[in-house]
């Protein structure tokens, strides 16, 4: 455990079907589940370390929607809590927005079954949104703002130092693409940020985790999933289209989504076009060699993407 002299913990410190399956199938499922658990703990631990998400004495408010991602986040954080190099508390929080058909017993029953501290906040934002937003318009934007304000207040009331959200790797890359395609800006989801009111720290411990892993873990653990579209509103067709594009891309070109995520952490501001990040107007030749300077006329070489299985070209002779 690497906590001496206020040294930040390392990633190693953190990561310390139908019908009844037969014995062989059961063993295979157990092996796959164990491997996935280790991978999830490793990736979440790495994110916590890389961005100093959780510190000694923190009280983490895990925002629970009842979807696969928030269940996975809570489960993995509780596993890490038992062997983490720092001591921290967890409280699971759900905002019941009084959407018609919301199964309000599901989350409290689950929280009680695992013995986690929890809080259910009852606020009828559904009626507010329906009253304010014209019929046929998406309610997601207003609903999100109301939810954010309420959760910040709950964090204050509970004495929480951090709010943990369940956004995963694919959410972050999709948001970057959405902003590029429809917003004309390069903006994704940060792994850690100070809230817009300046009073709260928000963390995304699943930022390195692909969605397929949270889906698989939810399946293994048989979490009581609550549908995400009870209100009948959808967050526009743009996100649906981008998510589908990324899924197809990942099938055809494995590893590209991971590469895009890495790119968000390796930004070369001199090779973009934002004058606020680089002073292009006053760029002048100095006569001094710069190893980081632009090779303006050179063709940039990129690593060859791995071919899909079965598509490799075999050369004979």
From Swiss-Prot:
The keyword tRNA processing applies. CDD domains: TtcA-like (cd24138). GO terms for biological process: tRNA thio-modification. Pathway: tRNA modification. Keywords: 4Fe-4S, ATP-binding, Cytoplasm, Iron, Iron-sulfur, Magnesium, Metal-binding, Nucleotide-binding, RNA-binding, Transferase, tRNA processing, tRNA-binding. It catalyses: cytidine(32) in tRNA + S-sulfanyl-L-cysteinyl-[cysteine desulfurase] + AH2 + ATP = 2-thiocytidine(32) in tRNA + L-cysteinyl-[cysteine desulfurase] + A + AMP + diphosphate + H(+). Binds 1 [4Fe-4S] cluster per subunit. The cluster is chelated by three Cys residues, the fourth Fe has a free coordination site that may bind a sulfur atom transferred from the persulfide of IscS. [4Fe-4S] cluster binds at residues 140, 143, 231. Its cofactor is Mg(2+); [4Fe-4S] cluster. InterPro entries: Rossmann-like_a/b/a_fold (IPR014729), TilS/TtcA_N (IPR011063), tRNA_Cyd_32_2_STrfase (IPR012089). One of its GO terms (molecular function) is sulfurtransferase activity. Residues 1-29 are annotated as: Disordered. One of its GO terms (cellular component) is cytoplasm. Its EC number is 2.8.1.-. Its main location: cytoplasm. It holds the Pfam family ATP_bind_3. It is found in: Cytoplasm. A motif (PP-loop motif) lies at residues 65-70. Homodimer. Catalyzes the ATP-dependent 2-thiolation of cytidine in position 32 of tRNA, to form 2-thiocytidine (s(2)C32). The sulfur atoms are provided by the cysteine/cysteine desulfurase (IscS) system. Belongs to the TtcA family. The thiolation reaction likely consists of two steps: a first activation step by ATP to form an adenylated intermediate of the target base of tRNA, and a second nucleophilic substitution step of the sulfur (S) atom supplied by the hydrosulfide attached to the Fe-S cluster. This is tRNA-cytidine(32) 2-sulfurtransferase.
């Amino acid at each position: 455990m690497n906590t001496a002299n206020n040294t930040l913990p390392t990633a190693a410190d953190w990561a310390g079907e139908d019908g009844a399956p037969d014995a062989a199938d059961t063993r295979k499922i157990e092996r796959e589940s164990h491997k996935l658990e280790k991978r999830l703990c490793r990736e979440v631990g790495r994110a916590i370390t890389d961005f100093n998400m959780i510190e000694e004495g923190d009280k983490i408010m895990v925002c629970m929607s009842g979807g696969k991602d928030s269940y996975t986040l809570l489960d993995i954080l509780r596993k890490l809590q038992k062997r983490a190099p720092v001591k921290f508390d967890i409280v699971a929080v759900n905002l019941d927005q009084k959407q018609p058909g919301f199964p309000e017993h599901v989350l409290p029953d689950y929280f009680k079954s695992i013995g986690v501290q929890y809080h259910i906040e009852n606020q009828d934002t559904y009626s507010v949104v329906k009253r304010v937003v014209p019929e046929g318009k998406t309610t997601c934007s207003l609903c999100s703002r109301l939810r954010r304000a309420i959760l910040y207040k709950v964090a204050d009331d509970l004495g929480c130092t951090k709010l943990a959200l369940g956004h995963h790797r694919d959410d972050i890359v999709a948001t970057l693409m959405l902003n590029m395609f429809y917003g004309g800006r390069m903006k994704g989801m940060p792994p850690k940020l100070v809230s817009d009111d300046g009073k709260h720290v928000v963390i995304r411990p699943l930022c390195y985790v692909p969605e397929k892993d949270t889906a698989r873990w939810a399946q293994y653990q048989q979490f009581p999933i609550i549908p995400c579209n009870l209100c009948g509103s959808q967050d526009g067709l743009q996100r649906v289209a981008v998510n589908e594009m990324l899924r197809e891309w990942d099938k055809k070109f494995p590893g590209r989504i991971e590469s895009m995520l890495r790119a968000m952490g390796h930004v070369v501001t001199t090779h973009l076009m934002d004058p606020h990040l680089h002073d292009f107007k006053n760029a002048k030749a100095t006569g001094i060699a710069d190893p980081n300077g632009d090779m303006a006329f050179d063709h940039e070489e990129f690593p060859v993407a791995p071919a899909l299985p079965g598509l490799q070209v075999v050369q004979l002779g």
